[in-house]
Amino acid sequence: MPLSSTMQEMTASDGLKLAYAIDDFSDPWGPQETLILIHAAMGSSRRLYKWIPILSRHFRVVRPDMRGHGRTQIPGPDQLSLTRLTKDVIELADHLGLKRFHLAGSSAGSIVAMRTAIDNPERVLTLANFASTPGLKPSNIDMNKWVNGIKAKGFKSFLEETIEERFPNVQDKGFLKWFVEESAKTDVDLFARFGPMMKEVDYTADLHRIKCPMLNVMPGHDPLGSKAQYEVYRQHVPHSEYIWYDGLPHNITDSVPERCAEDLLKFLLKHKGRA
């Protein structure tokens, strides 16, 4: 229902309880389209809070907490895979009665979004990728170093030591403290499963199967992925748009959230009403 902001819960087909937020401040009398917006690894959908005032005025925005993140339960030994994360998106859409929907993701959330669009082209109206190469396998991430560092020091200390790499030009100490505390809520053992799983992913050979309009927003100074690693989208997805954020490191969706949301909104409005 328009003019609302709520946190809700559903049960996936494997029994895991999934949490999701719905924000909708679009005109109640107008046609309604839904955007499913997927957060990055660590933290939860709360990391995308600054996007909501911009996007929810025009779209119903659904933000799931991925498995093991935020208010969603930690998955059991056999309940975490990329296939399962993709299935969660489709089951959430089914739960909400959505035949088709817009889809966007940040970093690891983009990996889930891309897989969903590849496997379910008939369901996805548009796809937006923020700061993700086609999987983490071709990226520059040393996942073993990350996991070992987090296990040895804990999430909070690990993030505090690497915060300058993520946000070299951010001066708001309150934001930096909030980011660390929010991201550090992630279960260490969960990330030790989630991170290496994502590091095995490379969608390059499947990108041609993305049939919907696609937006790629890429950080121009990303230590986790080179420009060449991002350019593969141009080679394999001809119906794509590209925006480079010159000089910015990986965490663009946190450091310049309003800019991200505004660029996404421009893209979505161009395709609104074409379902």
What is the meaning of each model-derived region?
Residues 230-251:
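Catalytic histidine neighborhood in serine/cysteine hydrolases
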Residues 248-261:
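Catalytic histidine-centered segment of alpha/beta-hydrolase-like enzymes
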Residues 83-100:
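Conserved acidic catalytic loop of the alpha/beta-hydrolase fold
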Residues 16-74:
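Conserved HGGG/HGGXW glycine-rich cap/lid loop of the alpha/beta-hydrolase fold
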Residues 210, 216-218:
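Short beta-strand/loop motif that positions the catalytic acidic residue
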Residues 220-225, 250:
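Acidic catalytic loop of the alpha/beta-hydrolase fold
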Residues 111-119, 123-153:
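Flexible "cap/lid" loop of the alpha/beta hydrolase fold
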Residues 137-141, 153-209:
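Conserved alpha/beta-hydrolase catalytic His-Asp/Glu region
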